[in-house]
């Protein structure tokens, strides 16, 4: 059985479906957060980059806000905060704050699975076949927030000068993450 959660973003109501197991997992996280809320002071700000499978141009500009609203609903359901979302037909950048008790990998997995199901069922994304297995996630100080927000806002203009593969590689290298070229941007 599935539950529906309402999300409002960019003046659009978007219904998102989340399976019962995911709902129970979030309830456990919320209870855990509430239990430790008065004891911990943590700021987690992530810049997450998701790429479509095989870099397909699957996110049409005229419908990207629907996807962004849907993703915002998922973020809200995890008690996260979306500061900015934007991208191009083959990738999405998100700047989010997540609860300290929520592992980034678990969140990204749920974000990709849920949004993938939604996009495949939505006629506005006929070219979408899934997200790439890889993703990039970088932590930042709250003092970097405005700089990253502006960077994400400027995606359309930025990609007139630089291809996504180059941008992606630069982000990864700037964050001192080792790249294995045998697997970099290669989908099975």
State where each predicted segment sits:
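Basic nucleic-acid-binding interfaces
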Residues: 2-188
